[in-house]
């Protein structure tokens, strides 16, 4: 194990409009080829669409979607005695947030629609209402962990 100092966890700065670091995490996940202004435009347009469709604060809808999509347990591959086991492991808070953001963006992008802003807004709204592909992915992850509960003693 390294004797060097442990690096500190760095959080991105909060975004300008909503003053939320979750929104800035979303912007940085949508980012492609370093084009941050386009990513910001997509996110803010999606939030405007959410506001029009739900008549609620888009930040609260987004936070609710993140909470609904965050997994509690996941499986990790662990090699023991020549065979690999899927070991259920609890998910930390930061990783749960990252996974939910990743899933929301992935399944939003896979939706049928014209612009990424519309697709992202619809996925966030569906996730906040506990429906959609993101919630299916979370439930699938939980089912995998439940099915492999017998290997929990291999946890590391």
UniProtKB/Swiss-Prot annotation:
Q: Which Pfam families match?
A: Ribosomal_S7
Q: Which UniProt keywords apply?
A: Chloroplast, Plastid, Ribonucleoprotein, Ribosomal protein, RNA-binding, rRNA-binding
Q: What is its main location?
A: plastid
GO molecular function annotation: rRNA binding; structural constituent of ribosome
Look up the domain of life of the source.
Eukaryota
Report the GO terms under cellular component. chloroplast; small ribosomal subunit
| One GO BP | translation
Q: Where in or outside the cell is it found? A: Plastid, Chloroplast
Describe the task this protein carries out: One of the primary rRNA binding proteins, it binds directly to 16S rRNA where it nucleates assembly of the head domain of the 30S subunit.
Tell me the protein family, please. Belongs to the universal ribosomal protein uS7 family.
State the oligomer form and interacting partners.
Answer: Part of the 30S ribosomal subunit.
Q: Could you tell me what this protein is called?
A: Small ribosomal subunit protein uS7c
